[in-house]
């Protein structure tokens, strides 16, 4: 997978880059594995904004992805590699030997026609899913469960992976993409390999409208607001805000650590991210 640069026919296209989509083998999704997607616009069940600067964007069909990989010891064939508008990674359509069809995240090196398997008997190759206790130390994995049977929650974005660096009793130690080293129960499932579409990080949007297609709205600076809207707001003319940068609720920005020290999961973090 690679990117290509567009011809500068307008200011918005001058620096714009897009994916070549050369790995895509099918243009329409499997109808039985799709459903409608209601726009949330950053609101919760009370209708209040919980994620700012969200709204709009193109209409999408949601592809139902198998993050649990709980169909064990049944071989599957990769029928197609498809585009998914709801995530940065590509997805692979699997046809199982018993006739069932499922989508999974497409890792690097997985191609149409390949055979994959989930379970204890699976080989250590991209796309196969095993429990962490059955994966050799040093292997890179993605779609990692945090709780057994809940489904993968870590390393699902394009190009991401974690490395299994040790096993200690009932825990496996993983080095996460952020550099954090944390313990995860060895009975959790993970998929071997790195998530595909690794050149996604090289894409340049080129214009504001392309962000709007993705459902991202403009970010207004605090110093440009009124005093009632932000701690940095107000003042005559342009001002610096008069204090250190903070969030709209007064929490210091620029590197202030906000993680609660009382979290039970703190004992599972061996090394925090960002530390040498």
UniProtKB/Swiss-Prot annotation:
Keywords of the record: Ribonucleoprotein, Ribosomal protein, RNA-binding, rRNA-binding
Domain of life: Bacteria
Location of region: Disordered: 29-54, 224-276
Entry-linked InterPro entries: NA-bd_OB-fold, Rib_uL2_dom2, Ribosomal_uL2, Ribosomal_uL2_bac/org-type, Ribosomal_uL2_C, Ribosomal_uL2_CS, Ribosomal_uL2_dom3, Ribosomal_uL2_RNA-bd_dom
Quaternary structure annotation from Swiss-Prot or TrEMBL: Part of the 50S ribosomal subunit. Forms a bridge to the 30S subunit in the 70S ribosome.
Family of this protein: Belongs to the universal ribosomal protein uL2 family.
Protein's name according to its UniProt entry: Large ribosomal subunit protein uL2
Organism: Maridesulfovibrio salexigens (strain ATCC 14822 / DSM 2638 / NCIMB 8403 / VKM B-1763) (Desulfovibrio salexigens)
